[in-house]
Amino acid sequence: MPFRILSLDGGGVRGIVAAKMLANIEKQINQPLNQYFDLIVGTSTGSIIAAGIATGRSCEDIVEFFQFKSSSIFPYESLFSLQRIPLLLKYGISAPKYSDNNLIQVLKGVFGETKLLDIGTSPRLLVVAYDTIERNPIIFKSWRPDKPYGNVPLWEVCVSSASAPTYFPAHKIDKRVIA
């Protein structure tokens, strides 16, 4: 029996393109993708899509997520928006383009208190982030209770992965700065 892997990368709101393609695949195979793939991997926006699929959401639901929530996650287009002043005061000239407050609230609303280990092995979920202080990748695995971060809420795993430098501030888990 083949071991099927789905790998999803970042791209901000362009994640809707991947979600629409996956919704089409889901229709074609007439099966939820969390039952079709053995391992789902994601980084940045791909981590949000991957976590959605791994927790049993349909790809149509994920498309709707992007349609209705992206404007609150990315609330303005210009670096010179007045909404950005608090970020500039906090971080100076290297301030990220967006605050992560809305991203956090939206993902908490989607994933609630679900922890990474709650997903388990069917399918396995792997999310990639980066420790900006230690300069090492952080690999979140849903199937490894012996590894760190298993009890981290899924929303926080996704925020860590989506905290791309220049777009969102780095996210801290256990005092480690992760982007």
Region spans (language model):
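Surface-exposed acidic, glycine-flexible loop patches that form ligand/cofactor-binding
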Residues: 29-34, 108-123
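Short secondary-structure junctions and interdomain/linker hinges
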Residues: 73, 114, 164-168
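Active-site gating loop/helix substructures
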Residues: 119-179
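Patatin-like phospholipase
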Residues: 2-7, 12-107, 141-147, 151-158
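Structural motif corresponding to the C-terminal cap of alpha-helices
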Residues: 25-29, 111, 162, 166
